[in-house]
Amino acid sequence: MHPRPHLITLSILAGMYILTQVIIVPALPDLQSQFKTDYKTIQFTISGYLLAVALVNFIAGPLSDRYGRRTIMLIFFFIFMLGSVGCFLSETLSTFLFFRILQASSAAGLVLSRAIIGDISSEKETVKMLGLLSIAMGIAPSLAPLVGGIINDFFGAKQIFLFLSIVSIFLLFIIFYDLKETNFKQTEDIFAQIKSYPILLISMNFWLPTITFSLSFSIFGVFFIGGPFIASKVFNLTPTVTGFYLACPSLGYILGNVLVSRIANIVSTKRLMFWGSLLLTSGPICSLIFCISFFHPLCFYLPVLLMTFG
C-alpha cells in the first residue's frame, strides 16, 4: 500500500506556484520605482516567471519518474527557497530577475502533486482529488494579491519575498516529514515520457483542448501584468485595494469550477466549451462598454470575473 500524504499538503504545494506568481502583482509599481526601471521591464517578473514555469512543467515529471517524487520535490522547493531569499536580498534588477526565475521551481508542486495522486489513488479517487486541487489553485490567486498588497502597504514591496522565504522553509519542513515516496516503479530511462511527446504533437485531441485552455489562461497573464498599472496610474488605487480587485478573476475561476463539477455529467464537454468561450468573449465587450460609460474600477475589473468564470 502506498504511503498517503495529507491532501492539504498536496493542495498547498500545488497552489504555491500561482500564489508566488500573483502575490507580487500589487507591488509591481513600487518594485518599478525601487529598481528605477520602466514598467515594461518590471513586467518580466511575471512573463519571465511563467516561461520558467513552463520549463519546470516539462522536466519535473520525467525527473520524478526516474529519481522519485519526494527527492525531486525537495530539490525544487530548496531552489524555490534560494530564489525567494535571493529576491529579498537583491540590490540590482538583473540579480532580482535571476532569482525571480528560480522561484518558478515551485511549479514542481503542481506537477508532482498530480503525479502523487495518480500513484496513491484509484481512477475514481484521482478525479475527485484533482478537483480538490483545482479549488486550491483557485483559492491561492484569490488571497495572494490581497496579502501581497497588505504586506506592500505596511512593510514594503521586497518584504513580500521575506514572507515567501519563510513560507518556503515551512514547505520544506512539511515535504520532509509528510511526503513519503510514492513512486515505486521508477524508470531507468529519464527520457521515456519525453519520447511520447511527438505522439501528442500530431493529435488533434491534444491540440484543441490545449489551445482552448492556453488562450483562456492567457487572460490571467494579461490581467495580472496590466492590471496593477491601470490600478495605480489610471484609478490611483493603493496596493491593498489593488489586491482586492485583482482577486476578481480567481473568484470567477472558482465559481466556474464548482458549476462544471456539478453539471459535467449532464452537459456535453463540447457544449460546456461553447458556453465557456461565449462568456470569455462577452467579458471584454462588457468591460469596454462599462469603461466608456462609467469611470470606476469595478467597470474594468468585474467583467474579468465573467471571463474567468467561462
Which positions does each model-derived feature cover?
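Extracytoplasmic
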Residues: 5-39, 60, 223-228
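Helix-breaking motifs and short loop linkers at transmembrane-helix boundaries and internal kinks
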Residues: 36, 68, 89-95, 122, ...
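Conserved MFS/SLC helix-loop-helix module at the cytosolic interface between two early adjacent transmembrane helices
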Residues: 55-93
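Paired small-residue
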Residues: 79, 83-86, 94-102, 298-306
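Helix-loop-helix hairpin linking two adjacent transmembrane segments in secondary transporters
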Residues: 95, 131-177
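Cytoplasmic helix-loop-helix junction between adjacent transmembrane helices
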Residues: 99-136
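Juxtamembrane intracellular "pre-TM" segments in multi-pass secondary transporters
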Residues: 180-210
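C-terminal transmembrane helical hairpin of 12-TM major facilitator-type secondary transporters
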Residues: 271-310
